[in-house]
Each structure stands twice: as C-alpha cells, then as structure tokens.
C-alpha cells in the first residue's frame, strides 16, 4: 500500500513508500481503509523535527474511513462501517489519568502518526474503544475534520463552558481557531470576534465569517484590544480562546478578558517558557484553563455538530491532494495559503 513515512530523525526525511498492509495487532482492533486524511500542524512540526516521534513511522492522525476487517473480540462494529478514530492509542488503561477517562494525557500513549503507524496510508489499524461512527450523509472529507473539531468542542464547551450571550474572543485564525469560533457560536455566544494576520485575509477570514465569526480583526492593521473594549463598553471579553501560541496573543488574551472572565489556552508557544502578565490575571480574578487534546464525549458532540453543518464546513477544506503531492501540500499549509488540507490515499 502507498504510505507517507517519516523515515528517520531530523528535518525532512519524509517520503512516499510502499508499505505492507498492517495486520490487526489485537483481537479488539480493526483494520480501516482510509478514505480521507487531514494534515495537522503536528505533521508539519514532525516534518521540521519539532515534535516527538519514533521513526520509521507512517504520519497522520486525522482520518476517516471504512472498516475492512475486525478482530475476533470486536462487538460494536463490522466490515463496511464508516468510522473515525480518536488518536489516543496505546494508553496504559491503569494510571490515575486513564482511570478518570483522561486517556489523552496518559504518559504511555503513543498516537498514530508519531508513536505508531498512522493514517497517511491506504490502511490503518485502531482499537475498537476509540472508534466513532460517521453520521449518515456525512462525506469522508468532512468526517476527516472530526479530530480538530473535537479539540475545539472539548476546549470551548467542556472546559471554557461558554454560556448563552457570552462575548467570545478567539485569538488565531488557524484551523482550530476557526473551528473554535464555529463551536462558540453554536454554543450560544452572542458575539464572536477572531483575530489573525495579513496572511488570513484571502482564505481564513472569509471562512471564519462563514462559520460564525461576527467580526474579524487583522492585528497587523488594527488594535484588537481597542476593538474588543469598544464592543464591550470597556469590560472586555467574557471568554478568550487563545489558539495561536503567539507570545503577543497570550499576553493580550489576559488583557482583553473581563474581570472574572475565562481564558482558555489551546495554542502551544515555541519556547518552553513564555512570559505572561500574571499580575493582571490575578487582579482580574481570571479563570485560566490550559487544554490539551480531547476526550470521548467531545468526539460525540463534535460529530453531532458537524452533521448539522455539513455544507458550511466544506469551506475549511482548501486543498485535496494524493500522497505523492505531500511536499506541495505541506508547503501551502506552512505558508498559510490554506486552512485544512486532505490526502486521499487511494488516489
């Protein structure tokens, strides 16, 4: 089968290879025929050697497909079922986090695409416990957005707990930021403002508007803080969702939140340590949530939300390519000339 492989440590070292179709490793696992697979920022970081991985490994953890084969202990799924999968494979199941259902943060976890072979291939294996059915009528392309959408749902609704009539600010107009704006609006936010850069003007800002952002702000041309304060009569945002990882955006998130507001941090900064206006956060009595990945409940909610917005979400998919065009697609997404790129491994 065709596959996109990170062959060795170091920048680059990615190539399309012929790999054997994987065998089901355990009785409660399934073999999935991959129909569409999304490119994540993590894949780009692995390309540049900026994220942990165990080569040689097939990349990709955002995928949708059809079950080709099931293990003898699989009970809820059968061949031909359409599924997506959470990426939290190889969690230990016995640590204090796993026992609380927080398998995504288990230290033993080795997700597809970096810790085990992933979905940038014609086939991938996953455990039954991580599967979710694709709703009837939803295309594989849209279903491949489930993983980042689940992250947005988990952080925006389950952690930030957005309430009806909240004023929500999203910093960063990347895929997660745009999805966070979409989820916030669906959760009842009265106003959603999203910030971005010059590079967002052509594609990302129009998609954000289409998916629910009331106002877009180019921070290279406008003063986001002044705009937010003007729109809220000087109070600030009820909820700030920080998705960019930018040092300036992290600082501004605290300054633009209202007293007793909520700040949800999703974006991961480059440096290990990032200065923040801690005094301002304390004086405002802010609630700050630091979030990583997503859980089972968020996936169910995300798929339900996506099923009701199937057509709207197509604006997020700006590139669709075969695996052979990986370098072009990675370059386009790195340059922010798109939002979500998909591979169709069978083409």
Task: Map each language-model feature to its residues.
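C-terminal hydrophobic helical "lid"/dimerization subdomain
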Residues: 3, 222-223, 251-255, 296-347
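NAD(P)H dinucleotide-binding glycine-rich loop of Rossmann-like/cofactor-binding domains
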Residues: 21, 90-171, 200
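Mid-domain Rossmann-like dinucleotide-binding core that forms the NAD(H)/NADP(H) cofactor-binding site
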Residues: 138-222, 226
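Glycine-rich phosphate-binding loop and adjacent beta-alpha segment
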Residues: 203-206, 214, 247-308, 345-347
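A glycine-rich helix->loop->beta "capping" turn
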Residues: 231-239
